[in-house]
Amino acid sequence: MATFPEPEWMERYRDRVNADPELEVIGSWFTASLSFAFGDRRYVVRVERGRIVDVNAAPRIDSRASFGFRAPMAVWAKFVSPDPPALYHDFFAMLMRVPEFVLEGDGLVAMQNARALHRMMNLMRG
């Protein structure tokens, strides 16, 4: 079993996202690069039409992303747990109430794709 947030876990996450029928419908306009910083580990994920087409597990400092999410591992561990505690059950709740969970970059791009992004984030619990 792949351990969060190792590259194998990200591959499984990519497969869940790409196989999700809901994202196939609501993600058709979601095209962007986003970053996930899980403590010290950072990934840049490229999404095209709601599908993850590339996972960069070793991005250089100049790897670009439209927006991203950054938090300590303890915060992410609560979010990806099968039964997350209050405030960690939804990334919108975390943005509002968990100061360590940070949206970086262009928040407008993130919110323009809020529904697809919300589904994509929830699939982390797969």
Q: Where in the sequence are the language-model features?
A:
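Feature captures hydrophobic
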Residues: 1-126
